[in-house]
């Protein structure tokens, strides 16, 4: 049986109203076991200052972002189940959900699904990559009981 080990780090000034650890686990389990047997993922929920700093340092973008993915690169010859880290900014996720008229829980789920696919090597830089990744995200979100996260863009 495939298993995802979750290391959840809540690094917000106010952690109230965040999804439960069991929800994060459910969202990870909907994605990762399809691709690899055992995995360990860290999800760190942060405020805008930390997201902004990481986004500037690692992507050269001078603003906070919804989710950053940091895949772990296993040295040659070693076998490790550590997949990587997701850093999710609480305030950006909450703002986007409100602006896009999406249920907050669904947007949290989407950020975990989206970030997990990045950890697994998916990307959306080129149009064909974006189509493949978005199709996978939609399939997983529907399987979790949420709407297509890209429905507004398709209308």
From Swiss-Prot:
PROSITE patterns: UPF0054. Zn(2+) binds at residues 114, 118, 124. GO terms for biological process: rRNA processing. GO terms for cellular component: cytoplasm. Binds 1 zinc ion. Its EC number is 3.1.-.-. It is found in: Cytoplasm. Its main location: cytoplasm. Belongs to the endoribonuclease YbeY family. This is Endoribonuclease YbeY. It comes from Shigella boydii serotype 18 (strain CDC 3083-94 / BS512). The gene is ybeY.
């Amino acid at each position: 049986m495939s298993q995802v080990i979750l290391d959840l780090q809540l690094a917000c000034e106010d952690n109230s109203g965040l999804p439960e650890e069991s929800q994060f686990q459910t969202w990870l389990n909907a994605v990762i076991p399809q691709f690899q047997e055992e995995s360990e993922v860290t999800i760190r929920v942060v405020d805008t200052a930390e997201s902004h700093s990481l986004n500037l340092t690692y992507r050269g973008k001078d603003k906070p972002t919804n989710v950053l993915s940091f895949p772990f690169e296993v040295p040659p010859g070693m076998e490790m189940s550590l997949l990587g880290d997701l850093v999710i900014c609480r305030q950006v996720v909450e703002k986007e959900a409100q602006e896009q008229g999406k249920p907050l829980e669904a947007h949290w789920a989407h950020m975990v699904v989206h970030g997990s696919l990045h950890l697994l090597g998916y990307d959306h830089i080129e149009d064909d990559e974006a189509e493949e990744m978005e199709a996978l995200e939609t399939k997983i979100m529907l399987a979790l009981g949420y709407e297509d996260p890209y429905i507004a863009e398709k209308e």
